[in-house]
């Protein structure tokens, strides 16, 4: 059996509240070397304010955690197996920290 290293944190409401900054920081601190962070917008991509949520999440990671997080966007399943889809997969595969949410 192949050993896999990593962590998953499942957070409920308030995932970007000040009370949970320490959870994000703990996960980030466990990463050896450079942190390559991605934000998946799929869970909330259907919402009219999805772009504003992306901006707020990027700002949260910048201000609260001093971390640049890059958007890995895939909002519509009709683009499955498109160039957009494979670009999304490539970003995820090259990341060692992934945030997906809220939604």
Summary of predicted features, one role per range:
Residues 1-103:
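Extended, subdomain-level signal for the structured scaffold at the beginning of enzyme domains
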